[in-house]
Amino acid sequence: MNYENVMIDLETMGVNNNAAIIAIGAVAFDFEGNLGPTFYETIELASSVDNGGVMDASTVLWWMKQSDEARKEFERDGLLEYVVLEHFADYLMSFGKDIKFWGNGASFDNVILANAYTRWV
């Protein structure tokens, strides 16, 4: 099946457009309700920060108030940010050139992800 839509969900340590990313999740879908291949990888927080990702105190405090299960994101062995970005690019390229991205508002997930790629160019 040919999927043209990909829903993106980032877990970040900030809310600005250069927020440090700790996970990238995505699922391909169509408007008939079919779900396609998924993607989920965690990023080593220090790697994202070392390469320009910004943390903010209010987001760190928010994460500290979340459930044990939600905070387990920080216990996973994340990969270097550029490695996850390469893996995610490969995932996206598997769908062809005409992909529509969906995220949590036009100014959050999509912008943060685009800025992360820009930092690595």
Task: Describe the role of every protein-language-model region.
Residues L92-M93, S107-V121:
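Substrate-recognition/cap helix-loop segment adjacent to the acidic, metal-dependent catalytic center
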